[in-house]
Amino acid sequence: MKISLRKSRDSGTVAPTRRRKWNWKTISIAGAIIAVLLLLFVLFQPRSLPRMGDAAMPDFGVSTSPGAIKGTVALASSTQLSAARQEVAGLERVAATDVLELFVNKSTAEAAVIDLRSAAVWWTNPQDRDQDGMASPLIKGKLGAQLSLTYLMPNGQTKDYDSFNDSVIHKTFTIQSEPDGMTVVYEFGNPERGAEAIPLKISKQRLEEKILNKLDQKDRNQMLTRFRLNEDTGIYERREIPKSALKKVLDLIEKAGYNEEDLKSDNEQNGVVEGEGGGSASFTVPLRYKLDGEHLLVSVDASAIKSQPTYRLHTLDVLSSFGAAGKKENGYLFVPDGSGSLIYFNNGKNYAQGLVLPVYGEDPSFFKTEQLNTYETVRMPIYGMKRGTSSFLAVIEDGDAMSTLYADVSGRQHEYNWIGPQFTVLPKDKVMLNAREELIKTPAEPYAEQLQIRYMFQNREEAGYSGMANAYRDYLMRKYQLKPLREQADKPADAPFYVEAIGSISKVKTFLGVSYDSPVPLTTFDEAGQMVKELAARGVFNIQMNYAGWMNGGIQHKLPNNVKAVRELGGRDGLNRLREQLQAQGGTLYPEFSLGRVYNDDGWNATKDSVQSLGRISLKFFRFNAANFKKNVEAFSHSLLSPALYPTVMSRYLEHAELLADDGVSVQDSGSEIYSNFNLNEPILRQKSIAFVSKALKQAADRGKVMLQGGNAYVLPYASQIIRAPMQSNRFQITDEMIPFYSMVMHGLIPYAGEAFNGVENQDVNKRMLQAVETGSNVFFSWLAASTEQLRDTMWDDFFAAEYSQWLDEAASAYRQLNELHHKVGDAFMIKHERLADEVVQTTYSNGMRVIVNYGNAPVQVGGAAVEAANYRIEEGSK
């Protein structure tokens, strides 16, 4: 189905006329006509949506730091602590709390943290890297770096520096002590003089006066060969100097007494900016360490980074080697791809690609012509590592939307298992000039705010991914003041049953040979009410209905400048009847709309209001062909609205939705997608978009209940319900085990469900139910009432398995079983998850309940009792 954007109105042209004599009457009439034409032009010109000012992150009223020490602290034995301090002998202690001590090596800038509760020592860099038989000297140096960066050359190519090879060995770093930590300031680049010390441009008079007249004839001739005279300007311009001759020319410059003051004067006189004269790139980057109670904070103030105009900082890796574990260590890396995965140390999977995971997924504002894989998104900006009986969880607190996680195992370039983030300080993209030529483009300004990582440490029985999940849940509760379900007085007794009702789509029809879009009702409001009745008759309660395609033209709706329920579905009265029916059953109606995705050009100015790429093109997105992975330009999907307009659009939607009396709102895209806007008039980097999303969602949450999809971490303070949360990982080759980390964090905080049971590749309801038992998620189906014959000749093949009459009985059966489990653990925290065998897992809850799931085809014995094949068992326990 092809959807064409209606073009903006044209103001027209005026045909040439013959000269004539004008009188006052003619002038008056002409003036009136012009005024009318101008009025019509203003009325029908596409208007840019009004902005609602800048956006700042909401204040959640957090009174204590997330790192504040909780309860009584049990320290390690004096013997253990003595051994730990012996390990850091020769280092200087720079800060301490009741549970952590921070040390620094003043010769190498390496840092170490001692956890006094276990005597575990966490190093920023592996201490035995010199014994690595696989690593080259350069790689050993990189293992000793706390920071690594890439920068852009004038031609768009990238080069890299690391803090060991390009700062520490040159002794161009300083350590500044602070009450709660320290800041290490690195000067990147070769401190020795290079071509930049030779003037790029110099007047004939000054070349003779400052250099040539102070040299003998032989040296003067040598120097003159390095410049060419521009006869038009009378300026000498430096030639390219080969490396073999550079030292000789520098010696002559020094011999003549030409100094930095002279160079600065010549540069200013001839318009040469710093760095334009060549030489090595140089950067100044401050890295701050701070102890915050139980946690270590590591940050870089991007606004304090200094660079040359010629060389621009592109990416920055922060503590990639923190905790790096060697070949003799036991443990794993935790990566948050989708539900979560573990990578066992030294797993030998060097045939597999190392892990590269953009936090919150890829930025859709970048140029893309094909889509090879659709993968589970990183919803939480976290990563971790378990070593022996200790572990850490790292939370990317600031700069999370600009970050990408990297992880790999030993055996590729060196003998260490490692994980860490890379921050894209200055995004770049390819812009095609023609079929063969491309140009690298960047925004005018880089990201200039904080980049911050918070390290949380776990020990003994809390060490591992279960302890990491408990720590992150506690962190979210403190940061966002989230109230557990068990403390919410109005929480329902029954488990939620999530159903997505598909309302109206558009279908191309013809009349007298003219094509037009016609609304096709798939589920009317009354038919959705019938779904509710039939579910209730089968023992399904607490129905949470996400109603998609209910307004302004259906699924691909117009912007909510005005909100009208689709007449073919039953209009406003039908919608309100459905809402009242759901409320009477103890459920909630969530009419869905898209905040950022725009499906047609009504109600906005596509030039001013849409997201632009770095090539200054207003982006349009198309569906991809599943056969060849290429973009299908005949299948338009959507455009993107500038994030700056989110609060305006939300305000308008809520204003009109109030008239429809709905008590919930479902936002289709904001919980799962975040992007930049490179519009020159209003550039917005991805990190700033989070503030606009938060401002808009807070408006909705202040008014009532909010259902979101995907569940990115920054939307959690505003979510009442989450659907399409990640229930599985990507199963990348390098990973070894899939874990329900997302669920472990969320259970007991916000009710959630994964993908619709009938919307996944494997539609075995029993298997989906078993996965829901393991992950603590709820039943979710995406349904329509009409026959799927209505979907023929449309792009909506996603809905071919959605006829609700075919799923009712299985859905109700799955719900009744999960509701029984919900009554036992629905508001409890999921405090432990473990794999007992290949296809047997056990989940433990904060109220002592345990749930064992057997995915296998044969019964298994656990704790002296059988768990039947493809089944589960609930065990009572003590808290």
For each of these PLM feature ranges, what is it?
Residues A471-L482, T524-E534, L641-S666:
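An active-site-proximal structural segment forming one wall of the substrate-binding cleft
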Residues F44, V104, A109-L116, T377, ...:
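Active-site-proximal substrate-binding groove within the catalytic cores of carbohydrate-active enzymes
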Residues K25-G31, L40-L485, G864, E868:
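N-terminal accessory beta-strand-rich subdomains and adjacent acidic, glycine-rich linkers
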